[in-house]
Curated annotation (Swiss-Prot):
Active site feature: 17
Localisation per UniProt entry: Cytoplasm
Alphabetic keyword roster: Cytoplasm
GO terms under biological process: tRNA wobble position uridine thiolation
Primary localization: cytoplasm
Source superkingdom: Bacteria
Protein name (database record): Sulfur carrier protein TusA
Family matches, as InterPro entries: Sulphur_carrier_TusA (IPR022931), TusA-like (IPR001455), TusA-like_sf (IPR036868)
Family assignment from sequence similarity: Belongs to the sulfur carrier protein TusA family.
Length: 79
């Protein structure tokens, strides 16, 4: 995938469920549609929770790196 232009980065390293998703929800609210939030996490639950959050809240998971921590997720606000 080509370079993704990140609007904001959210570091949730050391936080455990449900804190990472709660912070994602809080931070993505401040972005405009089409802007991108990069989430960095080490909680294994985020590999399930972030994609589910995107689907439920109608955001787009552009890319993820979940082979080993730290995990990274590029989420675009909106579809």
């Amino acid at each position: 995938m080509s370079e993704i232009s990140v609007t904001q980065t959210l570091d949730t390293l050391g936080l455990r469920c449900p804190e990472p998703v709660m912070l994602v929800r809080k931070n993505i609210r401040h972005l405009n549609d089409g802007e991108i939030l990069l989430i960095i996490a080490d909680d294994p639950a985020t590999t399930r929770d972030i994609p589910s959050f995107c689907q439920f809240m109608d955001h787009t998971l552009l890319q993820s790196e979940v082979e080993k921590p730290p995990f990274k997720y590029w989420v675009k606000r909106g579809k």
